[in-house]
Amino acid sequence: MKSSTQAVLEHTAIPKHIAVIMDGNGRWAKKRFLPRIMGHKRGLDALENMVKHCAKLGVQYLTVFAFSTENWRRPEDEVSFLMGLFLQALQKQVRRLHENNMRLKILGSRERFNRQILQGIEEAEALTANNTGLTLSIAADYGGRWDILQAANKLIAEGVSEITEDTLAKHLMLGDAPEPDLFIRTGGETRISNFLLWQMAYAELYFTDILWPDFDGKALDDAVASFQKRERRFGRTSEQLPIEQQRN
């Protein structure tokens, strides 16, 4: 049976692109007197459910922050486990994505990944490259400032004499995707932590105290419902918006 929230969502605008910082895995485990790595394992399960629910709602792009450039500073055993979990997801979950016509992209620097992970990334992206369903982008060893810098360096290398917003945007890691409409951060923190700094200029921000492993379909429905109540003006006045976009 559909919830009342789901019924409303089906008849109103769904964000085309959702970006998520999946925060709270460690605290979820700590509350249960479990090692932090167990929180990360449950976090992977939550991501699987998120992908399914986004596809069900009609979301076209889902971009998640899995591992930042700053996360290399974490304890060595935790970083090692996260890399292993990342490889496991690439090897096992990509088949499921492919079977459901979903595309997988990995965003970020690849300089510090080992050969096995690099091979896994290349194979996963190649397998799903021609799929036309939801695009799942996983930001790993990624930072928003790094993204802008690498785009600028590409333009310099190409000999571009004048950098415009359009040319820079096309050289970012998400250059072939629309900018996020909705940004969600779980775990109670209220910052964007160097994630998609350029691309989220006009995203609607949604923060929740729910820890990532507990973020389920209902929680996503609530986030989307909040998005739908907002009036996105992009610098214009309410009166300049089409009637259907104006908030009563």
From Swiss-Prot:
CDD domains recorded: Cis_IPPS (cd00475)
- Co-factor: note: Binds 2 magnesium ions per subunit.
Cofactor(s) the protein needs:
Mg(2+)
Question: Coiled-coil intervals in this record?
Answer: none
Enzyme class per UniProt = transferase
Q: Which residues does UniProt mark as catalytic?
A: 23, 71 (proton acceptor)
| Entry keyword annotation includes Magnesium | yes
Transmembrane region positions? none
Question: Which residues hold Mg(2+)?
Answer: 23, 204
GO MF terms, alphabetically ordered: ditrans,polycis-undecaprenyl-diphosphate synthase [(2E,6E)-farnesyl-diphosphate specific] activity; magnesium ion binding
User: What biological-process GO terms show up in the record?
Assistant: polyprenol biosynthetic process
Please report a single Pfam family linked to this protein.
Answer: Prenyltransf
UniProt: substrate binding residues: 24-28, 36, 40, 68-70, 72, 74, 185, 191-193
Signal peptide location: none
Q: Which UniProt keywords apply?
A: Magnesium, Metal-binding, Transferase
InterPro entries, alphabetized: UPP_synth-like (IPR001441), UPP_synth-like_CS (IPR018520), UPP_synth-like_sf (IPR036424)
Known partners and oligomeric status? Homodimer.
* Family assignment from sequence similarity: Belongs to the UPP synthase family.
Q: Which HAMAP family match?
A: ISPT (MF_01139)
Q: Provide the function of this protein.
A: Catalyzes the condensation of isopentenyl diphosphate (IPP) with allylic pyrophosphates generating different type of terpenoids.
Q: What is this protein called?
A: Isoprenyl transferase
State the species of origin: Neisseria meningitidis serogroup B (strain ATCC BAA-335 / MC58)
Gene name of the record: uppS
